[in-house]
Amino acid sequence: MYFDAKGLTSDFDIVGLPSSDLLVYLLRTLYYETENNMYRFILASQSPRRKELLKNIGAEFEVIVSDADESAVSGDGITPGLYVRELALIKAAATAKKVLKDKKAVIIAADTIVTLDGKILGKPKDDNSAREMLSSLSGRKHEVYTGYCVMRVKDGYTVCKSVKTDVYFKELTQEKINAYIATGEPSDKAGAYGIQGIGGLLVEKIDGDYANVVGLPVSALADTLESEFDINIL
């Protein structure tokens, strides 16, 4: 391969690309690599599910776990969407304090909750708590909200959004509930189930973004990065 005096490739094909397409491909690849060097993603979460979701879309990132005091945010008197956005914001802000000198840092923080009849269902305290939650969800529709914030450290520019997904549970017998609790999966999950694991067998259908239920609406996140920060994942 060579470039002529005008910077154009010679007329030949390589891996099925005509020369004009090859030039465009090379330039776009160079731009993408250069653009990637302009920022560094930091995920302010230790959630293995969020890490996996980001990896699945090809995003390169490192994890710096937030030490924010989530009890400082009360869900009383505000909508679930606002509540998760505020939780994500304090996580992002707490993590930003750790990397203030890193002007390439772009922080991604998120929080997910389950609501039923306007009541927030957090992580179960024990097996009995998980049993109560799963019994209340049986045969009914509930909502999963994930709030996320993207914060650019160099100037503090921050965008926070939330996404809602409706989840419909099957009718669950006590035997099924007990069997699911025995797997240990509900213990660290909001609403006492994980849709990406065995808990997916409890779900009849969903209306909305599946990844949002897992813990991070990556499609909406990618749109925010592109429209608000001029960062393209794809």
What are these regions (language model features)?
Residues 54, 88, 111, 130, ...:
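Residue-level signal for inorganic ion chemistry
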Residues 133-134, 147-152, 156-159, 164:
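Anionic-ligand binding region
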